[in-house]
C-alpha cells in the first residue's frame, strides 16, 4: 500500500468547503470528473480506499452510495455498524489506516484517500504521515460555514506544473475554478522532489486575504 495519505477537496476563495451541510456551489462536471479519476486510479488488481465522515457520506446522493470501484470507509464514534452501503466503519482516521494495513485488506488497497469533512481534513493534513493534497480552487466567495483551517495548511507548498503543462482556469455555469496540487513540506520530501516539481510556497493561495 502506498504510505502517502491522499486528500482531495474543493475550496472557495476563503477556504470554504461547505454551507448548510451541502456543497456551496453547483456541481461542476470537471471537478467531479477529476475527483473520480483521482480516487479510482490505482495499480492493477487493487482498489483505493476512500475515508469520510458520516455527514460526508450522507451528503452523497443515495443512488451514488457507495462510491463505485472504491472501498468506502465511514468514520463515526457513535455508530455500531457501517451505514447501509458502506463497506467498513472506523472510529477514527488512525483506525481506518489500521484497517487498510490489516491482513484482510493490505493486499487489496493501493491508496487511501480522505474526502471530507472539515474535521477529518484537519486531522489528515496535520498528522505525522506524508500527504499529497489535490485541491480545486473555486474562484468565488460562497459565504461558507465550514472551512479548511489555515493552520492545517501551514506546512504545505504548491507543486509546480510540469514542463509543457499550463495552469488553466475552467468555467462552468458562470463559476471559475482551477486545479492545484500541494505536498507537505519536510526536509526529506522537499529534497526528494525532482527539479521539475520543486514546490513553491503556499502563500498567497493559503493566505488570510485570499
Curated annotation (Swiss-Prot):
InterPro entries: DHFR, DHFR-like_dom_sf, DHFR_CS, DHFR_dom. Transmembrane segments: none annotated. One of its GO terms (molecular function) is dihydrofolate reductase activity. One of its GO terms (biological process) is dihydrofolate metabolic process. It catalyses: (6S)-5,6,7,8-tetrahydrofolate + NADP(+) = 7,8-dihydrofolate + NADPH + H(+). CDD domains: DHFR (cd00209). Pfam families: DHFR_1 (PF00186). Its EC number is 1.5.1.3. Keywords: NADP, Oxidoreductase. Residues 4-184 form the DHFR domain. SUPFAM superfamilies: Dihydrofolate reductase-like. Belongs to the dihydrofolate reductase family. This is Putative Dihydrofolate reductase. It comes from Human herpesvirus 8 type P (isolate GK18) (HHV-8). The lineage of its organism: Viruses, Duplodnaviria, Heunggongvirae, Peploviricota, Herviviricetes. The gene is ORF2.
Amino acid at each position: 500500500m502506498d504510505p502517502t495519505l491522499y486528500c482531495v477537496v474543493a475550496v472557495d476563495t476563503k477556504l470554504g468547503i461547505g454551507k448548510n451541510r451541502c456543497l456551496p456551489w453547483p456541481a461542476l462536471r470537471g471537478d467531479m470528473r477529476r475527483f473520480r479519476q483521482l480516487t479510482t486510479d490505482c495499480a492493477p488488481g487493487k482498489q483505493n480506499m476512500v475515508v469520510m465522515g458520516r455527514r460526508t457520506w450522507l451528503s452523497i446522493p443515495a443512488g451514488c452510495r457507495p462510491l463505485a470501484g472504491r472501498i468506502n470507509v465511514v468514520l463515526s464514534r457513535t455508530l455500531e455498524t457501517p451505514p447501509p452501503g458502506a463497506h467498513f466503519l472506523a472510529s477514527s482516521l488512525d483506525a481506518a489506516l489500521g484497517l487498510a494495513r490489516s491482513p484482510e485488506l493490505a493486499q487489496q488497497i493501493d491508496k487511501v484517500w480522505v474526502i471530507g469533512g472539515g474535521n477529518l481534513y484537519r486531522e489528515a493534513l496535520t498528522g505525522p504521515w506524508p500527504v499529497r493534497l489535490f485541491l480545486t480552487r473555486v474562484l468565488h466567495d460562497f459565504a461558507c460555514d465550514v472551512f479548511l483551517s489555515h493552520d492545517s495548511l501551514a506546512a504545505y507548498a504548491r507543486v509546480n506544473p510540469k514542463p509543457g503543462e499550463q495552469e488553466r482556469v475552467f468555467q462552468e455555469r458562470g463559476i471559475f475554478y482551477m486545479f492545484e496540487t500541494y505536498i507537505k513540506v519536510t526536509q526529506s520530501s522537499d529534497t526528494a522532489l525532482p527539479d521539475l516539481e520543486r514546490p513553491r510556497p503556499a502563500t498567497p493561495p493559503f493566505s488570510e486575504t485570499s
